Structure formats: C-alpha cells, structure tokens
Amino acid sequence: MSFSFNFDVQLTTKCQQDEENQPQDGNEYSEVEPVPGITITTQDETVKAAVEHFPPATPHSLLNDAVSETITIGTLPPLNFLNESVFELTAYERDDEEMILSQTTAQCSDLISGVYEGGLKVWECTYDLLELLERDGERFAEKIVLDLGCGAGLLGILALKRGASQVHFQDYNSTVIEHVTLPNTLLNCLEEEEEEEEEEESKGKKPGKRQNNDEVIIEEEEEESMKSTEKTKSELKNKQKNEEVEDGRPHAKRQALDSSQHPKLSGCRFFSGDWTSFLSLILKEDPSLKYDIIFTSETIYNKAYYSALHNTLHRLLAPGGVIYLATKTHYFGVGGGLHLFEQFVEEKGVFDMEKLWVVEHGLQRHVVAMHFKTKDRF
C-alpha cells in the first residue's frame, strides 16, 4: 500500500510534541437548551455554544497566501490541506476571537482542555483510518456523513470526493473550522473543479466560451453577467444579514447564497461547539437529520467527554449506519483510551464494537466500527 506526502514546503517548528491528545467540538460560551432524554454532566454550568459557519461571499479569500500539502494513500484521491508548520508560523497574522492560536504557541501545547481540543493538527489515527478506508473500500455515494471532531477535515473531505451527498464537519473550536477546515475543504473543491474544467476542454470545448441556445457568448459578456450576479448576491446577503434565528443559524436564503459559490460546497455544512450544544442544534432540524456514516478520530482521550460523545453518536446515527472510531490504546497524561471507552459503551448497551485494525508500530492504535445493537437499529 502506498502512502505518500507531497509537501510544498517543509519547516521545523519549536513546538513538536508527542501524540496523546485531539479534538472534541465550539464557539462562544452560553447556556444550551436541554435535549429531551439526554443527561450530561459537565464541570461547568455553561458549555460552548454550537454555531454553524458558512463560506464567505468570496471563498477564495480563505486561501490567500495559503501553503498546502497533499497526502496520497493507495488508490484514494489526493487530499489537500494547509501545511501545519507554515500555519503555526503565521498564526499571529490571523483573526482569532478564541485566542487559541496565541495560547497554544505561548504554551507550546497541542491541547488545552476546555479551551482548545487539538483540531489544528492532523493526528496519527486519522491516517490509520484513511488507510483502512482505502483497504476496505467503504462506499460513500449518496450517503450523509458526519466528521465529528473533524480538525483538518480529511475524513469528511474523502467522503465528499467519493460521492457523499452531504458531509457535515464539526469541531470544538470555531478557529479550527474557520482557519483550517473550511480552507481545506475549499482547496479540494477547487482542485476538483479545475479537473472538471480541464476534462471539458479536452473534449473540445474552447476556454472563454460556452454554448447557450445555439448562441456563442463571449468571455467579456460572461464576466459582466457574473459581476451583476455577484452584486445582486451581495445586496441580498446584506439585506438578510440580520435575519438570524435564536439558535444561531442564518436564514435559509442566506445559506443557499453562501453554498452556491462552489457546487461541491453545496453539500457541506460546518459547525463548531461542544458536542452537547451541537446535538441540540442538529435535533432541531426539520425533517430530522441522521447520518449514515460518522467518523470520529482521537476523540476519546478524556473520560469526561464520554457521555456527551456517546449521546451524540446515539442520537445522530441512522438505523443501519456505522461509526468509525480511530484511537490510541491509551492517552498518557490525559487518562482516556480505548479500553475505558469500551467499558463505557458496554455499560450503556446501545452499540456493538468491532475492532477492524490494530496498528502496532509506535503507540498502539486501533480502528473500531460501532453499530447499533439489533434491538436499537429501528
């Protein structure tokens, strides 16, 4: 099995630490409505409120001065993502309301519990899960996928490239979603659009022209039309800017305008927030939303998060769906790990767990599949 990286730039940073942490879910702190049937124990009376994030009116702005790298695993499509070293070195230039970029740099830390849950880094187990998906050939066509604790979003991006009808990304930190997940998703969407354009041109279509009702429309006319359309979109967006609902989600028309910037993005949604508040937000969807596939990588490092994670998986997995959990055997210094989570899941009696792969080199790691027990499937 081939496993290769294509780095546009390589740097060595002063904060290269070990591997026993990772994401959970976020944005601003506020109280969250209780979800019927769910009991959550937290260390604080408040949790990080769930917020849905949308691509900006000019998505390309997310990629200004971006330095990317590409990972290729076997027959999987290449996955593009921001170079972590460059991102760290340029962190001071970025807007960061959560202040996690400055804190992680100052503390030379990959994890600050309850503040920053590790989403700026791609962790080892994500690569393990990608390798397993390449080996086993999971099919994503027409499926609804959730990348829970997504970080860079590589798992969700793979599903998007493999034909998933919808892919939703969730991370604890809004900074991660806005500065990492969204740009990474756009990097891959742009690549696919360029490939499609090249394919069309190779079939004989001339650049700068298109056919419409047997008339040839010159590039200059197209540009004028695009400018007019963008102006209209901008005016509509400004008009709708204040049409926010109480749960933090924008007006439906605004969603459509934002997602229309790129066809591939129309099937993507992006969320930050604690798992409890994220679950509360998703359960308000009408019609109700369930996921055929849920990815969650390196999210069981802290025992305090198990209840919120389990409840989220329980309420959002579709009947007959599958959860892919990638994890280390034990997270030294944090306390969590696979054995403790298996015990927790067994006590709840909701899911069966199946070990799909054990990785022995380095710290022992696992990829596990979770399904509803037969009585809970429907």
Give the positions of each predicted feature.
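S-adenosylmethionine-dependent methyltransferases
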Residues: 1-378
